[in-house]
């Protein structure tokens, strides 16, 4: 039993009590490729066309063994604690489907944050509890732990947060993980743009911790849709139980393996993006219509600007696409600006100054 922050005592995390009963009883779909390990000389199990159209007539490895081994080496996380999804949106959806009973359970989502947590919960008919972030976009731990109840199964946290760009307080995130009996999902899509190690080193310390990362941002592989989910092997086993049998295509696996060999290139890109982020922050503050540029640990800046909606449409008319966040809580009159190449950033600054 735990007693934290003056709240009532709560039971320790127990995974089996958290998983939906039908999922616990579920016999997962199993292909012959699941049951057979290694390479065979004859494949007559999956009703494939035996005549190769290039190399794509066979189904891909359903377990992505080689790719997980490469990720394991980079992230220092065992392969059996890695789940790969079709973007991070797939594990987000699977976590909700595995642990939340439609019409009964709830998730908690501090706002503002990445919108797909809410969309996935709504698609699955899961109630959503919301707690506002503080004015500087950090966690209100007391409010979060007071808002959850016995039916709250998941808490989604994004750090660095989208759309604000800031890292959440490390200590506050740990307080939420320690004070909650369900799963806490920490989405670290933008973690490569910080000097911070993130929460991967704490996976074995907190059995209810799940960490999401992606190849879409710093690695420059958004088109292949490859999201990484790190958790205890028990949680990963549940996700593998309910995932589609061949959820990562061969093309995506090959592209990811090739991309992950270019660590030095990725690091150079990150260095350049951070340098441009600092330059953009400085130059944006000199534009009269800009009243605030929020501190960022990501590859974008949240900017408070006069008549943001109008500015957005004027930029669109000039073939410059940014993200209008002015209708999002705590983001009145804000645009989110991705850090582009120096040329792209120069074009954006030039047009903003001309408006």
Task: Report residues per predicted region.
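N-terminal "arm"/small-domain region of PLP-dependent enzymes with the aminotransferase-like
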Residues: 4-74
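PLP-dependent enzyme catalytic core of the Aspartate aminotransferase-like
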Residues: 6-11, 317-318, 327-355
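Phosphate-binding glycine-rich loop
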Residues: 68-106, 124
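Short acidic capping loops at alpha-helix termini that bridge into adjacent secondary structure
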Residues: 78-82, 103-106, 151, 188, ...
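PLP-dependent aminotransferase-like
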Residues: 101-157
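Active-site pre-lysine segment of PLP-dependent enzymes
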Residues: 122, 139-150, 163-184, 188-221
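PLP-dependent aminotransferase class I/II
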Residues: 208-286, 293
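Conserved PLP-binding catalytic core of the aspartate aminotransferase-like
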Residues: 274, 286-318
């Amino acid at each position: 039993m735990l007693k934290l922050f003056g709240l009532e005592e709560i039971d320790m995390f127990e995974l089996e009590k958290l998983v939906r009963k039908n999922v616990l009883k579920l016999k997962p779909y199993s292909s012959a490729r699941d049951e057979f390990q290694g390479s065979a000389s004859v494949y007559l199990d999956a009703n494939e066309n035996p005549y190769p159209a290039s190399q794509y007539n066979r189904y891909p490895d359903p377990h992505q063994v080689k790719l997980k081994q490469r990720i394991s080496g980079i992230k220092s996380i065992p392969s059996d604690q890695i789940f790969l999804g079709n973007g991070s949106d797939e594990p987000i959806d699977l976590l909700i489907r595995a642990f939340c009973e439609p019409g009964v359970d709830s998730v908690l989502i501090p706002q503002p944050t990445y919108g797909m947590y809410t969309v996935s919960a709504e698609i699955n008919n899961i109630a959503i509890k919301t707690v506002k972030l503080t004015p500087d976009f950090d966690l209100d731990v007391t409010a979060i732990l007071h808002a959850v109840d016995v039916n709250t199964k998941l808490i989604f946290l994004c750090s660095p947060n989208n759309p604000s760009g800031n890292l959440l307080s490390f200590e506050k995130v740990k307080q939420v993980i320690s004070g909650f009996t369900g799963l806490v999902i920490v989405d670290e899509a933008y973690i490569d743009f910080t000097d911070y190690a993130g929460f991967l080193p704490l996976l074995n310390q907190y059995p209810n911790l799940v960490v999401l990362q992606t190849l879409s941002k710093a690695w420059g592989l958004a088109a292949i849709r490859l999201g990484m989910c790190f958790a205890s092997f028990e949680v990963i086993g549940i996700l593998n139980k309910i995932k589609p049998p061949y959820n990562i295509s061969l093309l995506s696996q090959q592209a990811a393996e090739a991309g992950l060999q270019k660590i030095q290139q990725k690091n150079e890109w990150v260095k350049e993006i951070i340098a441009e982020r600092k330059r953009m922050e400085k130059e944006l503050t000199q534009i009269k219509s800009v009243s605030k540029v929020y501190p960022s640990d990501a590859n974008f800046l949240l900017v408070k600007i006069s008549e943001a909606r109008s500015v957005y449409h004027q930029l669109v008319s000039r073939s410059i696409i940014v993200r209008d966040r002015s209708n999002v809580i705590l983001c009145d009159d804000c645009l989110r600006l991705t850090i582009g190449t120096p040329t792209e950033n120069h074009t954006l600054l030039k047009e903003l100054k001309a408006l």
